[in-house]
């Protein structure tokens, strides 16, 4: 069987630190975080007061007012990011084989705001007043369907939910679909819009969220004073193609996807394995498929949620696989935690880091926990060559998903 090389030819996103790749990368370079006081609902009775909300979402660019009746925000975010990715890739969707054009949009929670709104309506006004579009708007697979319908993609179409590992698993699935010849083009990523009372209350009940009042110190991965993650929102979508397909249409290639590792801790519903056993295996699998040695990896975009449990295990896993020298940073210090969309947005961050040979700092972090042995970049970013990089994501349920990328050098 012929194995195809898989390349990234475009991406788009909406995020707390930018609604274009250029805005997003500029924020990562200059240290502009997207965390602030929650504005989406009254949080006065909550212990949590900060989130990372999408700012200045360009709704009017692709949507009209009635679209809010058809799409939950998580679908709107995915549709926006998908259109931006297709445009960024200069992809003429009418000129490609639609049967070999697939879509995967991951989401950890889906349309939770729609569910919350309609449950309130149910209790206040009765069952006959629940809106007909409630379930279609809320279903976590609907963003994939909506994106496929927007572009007429008749190939693979699915949604993946492995909690906070969802987007990396989606990209890994798309990568393999092209590598093994099932598709030519995949529009893939993740989307989330979960800054809602119920979602915040639920994660608050788990003591998973940061209760720090100062936004600049709310998401501080690997720091000794970290006390939880900051809820973020947004979407990232990438265009993946076989190298042959991309070259045939004269596409600009941004990076190559070279490896994917997926494992399960099978340990605990919400806590990662304390020694990072699943994370270690996932990183090793990604490197094995990429056919690279640990010494070739020059940057790790860490899962780095700013929770006490995650960073201890992840730091140990990184050191076990890659050693103590490879630069590590967490862009969740800028964006908060986008749950099911985290991997896609962080894949874009990783590729941008490779393209610019610059490791973004871990913003807000000032003093590492004593047991953190990984080479965490904080205080300022780091200029260095990045020929290969990996991006880690781990999720509730013990899910571990790791992607390996290669900088594109026209060969």
Where are these regions (language model features)?
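Conserved small-residue
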Residues: 10, 28, 82, 103, ...
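Glycine-/small-residue-rich "gating" segment that lines the acyl/pantetheine channel
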Residues: 125-131, 172, 176, 194-248, ...
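Active-site-proximal alpha-helical scaffold in enzymes
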Residues: 78-91, 140-143, 148-153, 157-192, ...
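A glycine- and small-aliphatic-rich helix-loop capping segment at beta-alpha/alpha-beta transitions
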Residues: 22-29, 113-127, 177-180, 200-213, ...
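ACP-dependent fatty acid/polyketide chain-elongation machinery
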Residues: 1-67, 244-254, 348-362, 406-411
């Amino acid at each position: 069987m012929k194995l195809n090389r898989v390349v990234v030819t475009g991406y788009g996103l909406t995020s707390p630190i930018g609604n274009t790749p250029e805005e997003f990368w500029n924020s990562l370079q200059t240290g502009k975080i997207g965390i602030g006081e929650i504005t989406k609902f009254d949080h006065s009775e909550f212990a949590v007061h900060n989130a990372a909300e999408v700012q200045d979402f360009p709704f009017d660019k692709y949507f009209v007012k009635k679209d809010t009746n058809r799409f939950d925000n998580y679908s709107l975010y995915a549709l926006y990011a998908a259109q931006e990715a297709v445009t960024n890739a200069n992809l003429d969707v009418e000129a490609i084989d639609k049967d070999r054009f697939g879509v995967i949009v991951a989401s950890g929670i889906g349309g939770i705001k729609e569910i919350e709104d309609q449950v309130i309506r149910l209790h206040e006004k009765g069952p006959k007043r629940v809106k007909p579009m409630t379930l279609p708007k809320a279903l976590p697979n609907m963003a994939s369907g909506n994106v496929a319908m927007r572009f007429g993609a008749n190939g693979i179409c699915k949604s993946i939910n492995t909690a906070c590992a969802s987007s990396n698993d989606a990209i890994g699935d798309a990568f393999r679909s092209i590598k093994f010849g099932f598709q030519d083009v995949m529009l893939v990523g993740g989307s989330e819009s979960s800054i809602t009372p119920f979602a915040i209350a639920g994660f608050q009940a788990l003591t998973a969220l940061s209760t720090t009042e100062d936004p600049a110190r709310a998401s501080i991965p690997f720091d000794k004073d970290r006390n939880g993650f900051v809820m973020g929102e947004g979407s990232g979508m990438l265009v993946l193609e076989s190298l042959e397909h991309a070259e045939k249409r004269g596409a600009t290639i941004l990076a190559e996807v070279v490896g994917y590792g997926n494992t399960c801790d099978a340990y605990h519903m919400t806590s990662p394995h304390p020694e990072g056993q699943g994370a270690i295996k996932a990183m090793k699998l990604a490197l094995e498929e990429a056919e690279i040695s640990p010494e070739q990896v020059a940057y790790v975009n860490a899962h780095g949620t700013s929770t006490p449990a995650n960073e201890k295990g992840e730091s140990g896993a990184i050191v076990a696989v890659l050693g103590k020298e490879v630069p590590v940073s967490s862009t969740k210090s800028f964006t908060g935690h986008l749950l099911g969309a985290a991997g896609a947005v962080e894949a874009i961050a990783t590729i941008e880091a490779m393209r610019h040979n610059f490791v973004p700092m871990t913003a807000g972090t000032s003093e590492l926990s004593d047991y953190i042995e990984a080479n965490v970049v904080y205080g300022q970013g780091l200029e260095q060559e990045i020929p290969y990089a990996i991006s880690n994501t781990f999720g509730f349920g013990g899910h571990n998903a790791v992607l390996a990328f290669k900088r594109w050098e026209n060969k």
